[in-house]
Amino acid sequence: MSKEKFERVKPHVNVGTIGHVDHGKTTLTAAICTTLAKVYGGAARDFASIDNAPEERERGITISTSHVEYDTPARHYAHVDCPGHADYVKNMITGAAQMDGGILVVAATDGPMPQTREHILLGRQVGIPYIIVFMNKCDMVDDEELLELVEMEVRELLSEYDFPGDDLPVIQGSALGALNGEEQWEAKIIELAEALDTYIPEPERAIDLPFLMPIEDVFSIQGRGTVVTGRIERGILKVGDEVAIVGIKDTTTTTCTGVEMFRKLLDEGRAGENVGALLRGTKRDEVERGQVLAKPGSITPHTKFESEVYVLSKDEGGRHTPFFKGYRPQFYFRTTDVTGDISLPEGVEMVMPGDNIQMVVELISPIAMDEGLRFAIREGGRTVGAGVVAKIFE
C-alpha cells in the first residue's frame, strides 16, 4: 500500500473548537469529520479516537490535543480539539496550535457558561482573528424563542470582547444528530463547513508577509564585513534590499549586500530558511543576538505590554511556589532573554504554578514586537511560564 500523496492544491486553513466543558466540542469535531467524509470524501473519525487525545510537550508544557483533518470542495482544514479546559488555555497561550479561526461551541440547553466567556477572552488576547458559533444540542430544545434568546446572548458576549457579534455566523445544530446520520442535522454541519469557507479568509502565507529574521549570531568576515545569521521568520530577503536592525538599541538601517546558505551565495532567502546576511558598513559590535533584521518600518521596538501568561505547574518542571508583585524574571523573545518587571491585575496578590493570568510587563530594554508574539518566562535559563503579547502600550 503506497502512502497517499499530500496534494498541495487547496488552500490550507487551521481551525479549532473552543467552548465550555461538555457543550459538545469533541462530538462536533467527530461530526464534522464524519459528515464531510460522507459528502466530500476523506477519512471519518469517531468520537473515541478524538477524545483520547495524545499528550504533547510544547516548550516543556504538557498539552493534550487531538489533530484532525477534513476537506471541503474549496479548502483543506487542520482542526484541533482539546479534552480539558487547562489544555485549551495552554494551547492558546503557547500558540502550539495557531488558529486562523475558532468554532465556538455553545449548548443551546445551557447558553453561555463561564468557560465560554473565558475562551472568548483568551481568543481575543491571543489573537484568534475570526470566530464562528455552533449552537449545539438544538434537538433538545423545542422552544424557538429559547433558541433565539441563547443566540442573542452569545452574540452579545462576543461583542463584549470586540468580536463582530452581530455579523458573525451562528449555526443552530446538533452534533450528535449529525453523527447519528440524521439528515436535518447533517445539513447543519455542511452549513458550518460553508461558513468556514466563506467567513474565514485565506490566511496569508509567511512568505507574503514583510521580511523579518531574528538574529542568532554575528560574525565579522575579513574584507567582507559583518554577517548576521538566523532563520527567516517571514517574507523574502533579496540582495540589495534595505533592512532595519530593530530592538535592544536604537533602530538603524543598512543594506543587505549578500545572502548565503551553506556557504553558497544566493539572490534571496525565503521564510523558513537559515541564512547568513552580509550587512553593508555595519560593525561587528553594532548588532547582537536578540535584535531582528526586518523590512524598514514593518516592526517597532517596545518595552511595555499587556500579556496573557500560563505559569508552568510543578509537574511540568515549573516553580514549586507562587510569585508575587515585584517578581523580576527574564522574558525570552525569539533568541534572547530580557529582564522585566510585572504588574498583576487589581485584587491579585499572588500567582500559583498552573495558573493563567493577565499581566503587564515592562522590559529593561526594547524588543521588536507585534501583538501575538509568543515568549517564555525564565529563571536562570529554566522555563517557568509561557505568554503572548496581547496589547502593546509603549
Swiss-Prot record:
CDD domains: EF_Tu, EFTU_II, EFTU_III
Keywords: Cytoplasm, Elongation factor, GTP-binding, Hydrolase, Magnesium, Metal-binding, Nucleotide-binding, Protein biosynthesis
Domain of life the protein comes from: Bacteria
UniProt region (G2), positions on chain: 60-64
Catalytic activity: GTP + H2O = GDP + phosphate + H(+)
Function, in words: GTP hydrolase that promotes the GTP-dependent binding of aminoacyl-tRNA to the A-site of ribosomes during protein biosynthesis.
Similarity remark: Belongs to the TRAFAC class translation factor GTPase superfamily. Classic translation factor GTPase family. EF-Tu/EF-1A subfamily.
Name of the protein described by the UniProt record: Elongation factor Tu 2
Organism: Vibrio vulnificus (strain YJ016)
